[in-house]
Amino acid sequence: MNDDQWVAGISKKDAGRYSRQLLVDDFGVSGQKNLKNLNVLIVGAGGLGCPVATYLGAAGIGTIGIVDYDHISLDNLHRQVAYKEDQVGKSKAQALADNIKLQNSDLNVQVHNTSLDSSNAMQLFKNYEIVCDCTDNVATRYLINDVCVLLNIPLVSGSALRWDGQLSVYHYGSDCPCYRCLFPSPPDPNSVTNCNEGGVLGPIVGVIGSMQALEVMKIAAKVRTTLAGQLLLFDGREGKSRTIRLRKRDPKCEVCGDNPTITAPIDYVLFCGAGAHDKIENLKLLELSDRVNVTEYRNKRREQKPVLLDTRPSLEFEIAHLPEAINVTLKECRSLSAEDISNRLGLQNTEHSDVFVICHRGNDSQRAVLLLREKLVDIKFRDIIGGYEQWALKINDMFPLY
């Protein structure tokens, strides 16, 4: 026998690079080969997308596509750990692609620096075999789900908020439900909270994103114990997780059922009643006569100390507030009696007939005005347009933005 001959299951380079995962039961050489031939699309290059892309890139996925239209901002860095300070302002999709290529130069990374919508999703998805939903809004979740079903692509979906995270695999196997099977109708837009409003801890998205990457690797390696048909719930505060079994595919589902009525992407903004993005939309609930801008309020407070009601949760109030602000949260505006609110604001000991109402961005303050003027009919409540965000942008640039 010739000493220079051997049977190679994998190249010397790949054996050296991926040796530790080649030694894992149920993964091995076949799993690594499957990874190398796999095309995975990551939708969203934020807190979830960063660990998904980082771990899949390191694991040796053949092609990774990244879809995101947004740019890196300073308040991303605590949870979007693939980015650095000197990348603030740059394209997330491009920066994430560049960073994972630095870790593994063999990767083929496709950058889709665009907003995903009904007009381009089918074209974007058709060249990929697994999709990871790393987004943070309901409309895009329905869009991603429907397109994955229409193209018969497994969907690995994660979400995270505050201390908690969730993870599931949809449309993978004949009995596995899709997202629409479980949620045929979207939630009320006013009941939905994303991390821009509710906050999230960085390690939470790190855990969920890492597990999304793991599910992709399990699907690629054909490991039978995936989260298809199950929902993993992670409680970071308690350090606990549990898995619940989901109901099976709904034969009456509009997109994956026996007689589907959705055979192409629809208008998801119309369907959900909310935009397909995670930005906070500025509401217009009040007439202009019931509102003042931050410049007008600044002029008022220079004349005399006004009564200022701050509707933000106490955690946000602690970050920063104007000296005259009195913290009565939106929840308290709903629950407290007129007398209690009057006492909190000190209205019984003052001749003030005007009360100004402020919040983070000017949405909750409008909701509060609608509530308060029903309870205290003799008081003129006025919302401050744009809230503290506009105060920081136009009046005092040292006021903390968050």
Curated annotation (Swiss-Prot):
Residues 302-400 form the Rhodanese domain. Its cofactor is Zn(2+). Zn(2+) binds at residues 178, 181, 253, 256. GO terms for molecular function: ATP binding; metal ion binding; molybdopterin-synthase adenylyltransferase activity; molybdopterin-synthase sulfurtransferase activity; nucleotidyltransferase activity; thiosulfate-cyanide sulfurtransferase activity; URM1 activating enzyme activity. The active site is at residues 195, 359. GO terms for cellular component: cytoplasm; cytosol. Coiled coil: none annotated. It comes from the Eukaryota. Its EC number is 2.7.7.80, 2.8.1.11. Its main location: cytoplasm. Pathway: tRNA modification; 5-methoxycarbonylmethyl-2-thiouridine-tRNA biosynthesis; Cofactor biosynthesis; molybdopterin biosynthesis. One of its GO terms (biological process) is tRNA wobble position uridine thiolation. ATP binds at residues 47, 68, 75-79, 92, 136-137. It is found in: Cytoplasm, Cytosol. It catalyses: [molybdopterin-synthase sulfur-carrier protein]-C-terminal Gly-Gly + ATP + H(+) = [molybdopterin-synthase sulfur-carrier protein]-C-terminal Gly-Gly-AMP + diphosphate; [molybdopterin-synthase sulfur-carrier protein]-C-terminal Gly-Gly-AMP + S-sulfanyl-L-cysteinyl-[cysteine desulfurase] + AH2 = [molybdopterin-synthase sulfur-carrier protein]-C-terminal-Gly-aminoethanethioate + L-cysteinyl-[cysteine desulfurase] + A + AMP + 2 H(+). Binds 1 zinc ion per subunit. Keywords: ATP-binding, Cytoplasm, Metal-binding, Molybdenum cofactor biosynthesis, Multifunctional enzyme, Nucleotide-binding, Nucleotidyltransferase, Transferase, tRNA processing, Zinc. In the N-terminal section; belongs to the HesA/MoeB/ThiF family. UBA4 subfamily. PANTHER family: ADENYLYLTRANSFERASE AND SULFURTRANSFERASE MOCS3, UBIQUITIN-ACTIVATING ENZYME E1. Plays a central role in 2-thiolation of mcm(5)S(2)U at tRNA wobble positions of cytosolic tRNA(Lys), tRNA(Glu) and tRNA(Gln). Also essential during biosynthesis of the molybdenum cofactor. Acts by mediating the C-terminal thiocarboxylation of sulfur carriers URM1 and MOCS2A. Its N-terminus first activates URM1 and MOCS2A as acyl-adenylates (-COAMP), then the persulfide sulfur on the catalytic cysteine is transferred to URM1 and MOCS2A to form thiocarboxylation (-COSH) of their C-terminus. NCBIfam families: PRK05690.1 (NF004281). This is Adenylyltransferase and sulfurtransferase MOCS3. The lineage of its organism: Eukaryota, Metazoa, Ecdysozoa, Nematoda, Chromadorea. The gene is moc-3.
